[in-house]
Amino acid sequence: MAELDLSAGNEGQSADISELLGKEEKRILTTGNAEIDKKIADGLPLGSLILIEGENDTGKSVFTQQIISGSMRNNLRVDLFSTELTTKSFLTQMESMSLDISDFFAWGYIRLFHCHLVEFKWTPEAMNDILERIIMHVKFSNADVAIIDSLTIFTEYTSQEAVLSFLTQAKNICDQGKTILITMHSYAFSDETLTRVRSICDAHLLMMRKLMGDKYVMVLEVVKVRGARKTTGNLVSFEVHPGYGMKIIPVSLAKV
């Protein structure tokens, strides 16, 4: 059986998050950036299974980090399962985008679980075991939001049916009130399976890179959001700026 260390990258001390926030909670998942939230149906309903799909370097992780920042502002606990980030690199990235979450991390409102599997034997049985461990942790965790960044690596060593079963279990957990965000590369599944994956999820955000003028920009398409306050189908063009994070590019400028 595979061994996966689900010990978080911080001590998880207890305190009232409202003491850090200084304001009342808001029961919707937002990025903490009003300009971006307007484009994603005024925020994503809590209790949703959210798919963030895109190729390499399209801003999937950056978007989840904005969600983490918004979650802290809205009195929500977050568990982040990352296949790439260490505690140090996570905090450094957040700081580089002026998303200061160090106090929340120190108090345990954000917990980072490292999925760096050193000297790990990649087998379908082992990967299925890891997926089961993750889903059980999410089910019994006191976190309001779970982020899996990314699911792609697991799809390479296990069957697509096993991943679909994982997503179905995740959807059942969301029906009980938890919110789960999953990032995934578009190439991870066949077209038929990808259609099934998208249908399971309550929200589907598609991240792309587009050449506009003489430069590439990132584009977020809101494909669907069940229970959204506003209609979906919006396209958001943005760049990632050091010291600022996601910066919306007006359509008129993006087309120049």
Across the structure, where does each feature detected by a protein language model lie?
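Phosphate-binding/switch region of NTP-binding enzymes
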Residues: 184-245
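Loop/turn-to-beta-strand initiation segments
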Residues: 77, 109, 142-145, 176-184
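Phosphate-binding/switch loop-helix module in NTP-utilizing enzymes
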Residues: 115-175
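N-terminal pre-Walker A segment at the start of P-loop NTPase domains
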Residues: 15-34
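C-terminal regions of RecA-like/P-loop NTPase motor modules
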Residues: 1-21, 228-256
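Conserved P-loop
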Residues: 55-118
